[in-house]
Amino acid sequence: MNNLLAVIELLKQNQVVAYPTESVFGLGCNPNNEEAIRQLLQLKNRPIEKGLILVAPTKELLLPYIDESQLTEKHWQRFDTITEQAVTWIMPVHKNVSHYLTGKFNTIAVRLCRVPAVVKLCESLGFALTSTSANFTGLPPCRTALEVKQQFGDHFPVLEAETGNRMNPSEIRDIFTQHIFRQG
């Protein structure tokens, strides 16, 4: 990760970057900056209504976005359980979270991601990252830094590191019902 410090600086400056997740590269930015989120949505041509996933290596970095009052110990155990398949959980959203993150929903999508690159980024920054697959509409998600450069251009900031080598994107589940919205 020879460009880790440069990518961290860009994220501090509210820029959009690409970074490796469990299976593909994601596009991410500071979830606390609406202008950065708008840039990400525009770059990807993603409708605001869809919302975004937040990833972090620890629950503590995701707590500012979650309405904890609706969750029991059972829900937190479910959330904390490490499985072979990466799981994005649909959870109750804290009232102060921007609609740029939630889209048309009154929930927030969050995932514990322990890929080394995500751990290093989030620990250095002190916040979670937005995550949506690094690809343009109609093209497959990028699985390598080279593929990101091919789709987004040589000058697009990408953290040159390995994904978690999972084949499928994360499964998306409801924390209360465990209903699967997207199979992983």
Curated annotation (Swiss-Prot):
Gene Ontology terms: cellular component: cytoplasm
Task of the protein: Required for the formation of a threonylcarbamoyl group on adenosine at position 37 (t(6)A37) in tRNAs that read codons beginning with adenine. Catalyzes the conversion of L-threonine, HCO(3)(-)/CO(2) and ATP to give threonylcarbamoyl-AMP (TC-AMP) as the acyladenylate intermediate, with the release of diphosphate.
Main location: cytoplasm
Biological-process GO terms, alphabetical: regulation of translational fidelity; tRNA threonylcarbamoyladenosine modification
One term of GO molecular function: double-stranded RNA binding
Location of the protein in the cell: Cytoplasm
Keywords, ordered alphabetically: ATP-binding, Cytoplasm, Nucleotide-binding, Nucleotidyltransferase, Transferase, tRNA processing
Family affiliation: Belongs to the SUA5 family. TsaC subfamily.
Superkingdom classification of source: Bacteria
Protein name (Swiss-Prot/TrEMBL): Threonylcarbamoyl-AMP synthase
EC number(s) per entry: 2.7.7.87
Occurrences of domain YrdC-like (ranges): 1-184
Swiss-Prot/TrEMBL catalytic activity: L-threonine + hydrogencarbonate + ATP = L-threonylcarbamoyladenylate + diphosphate + H2O
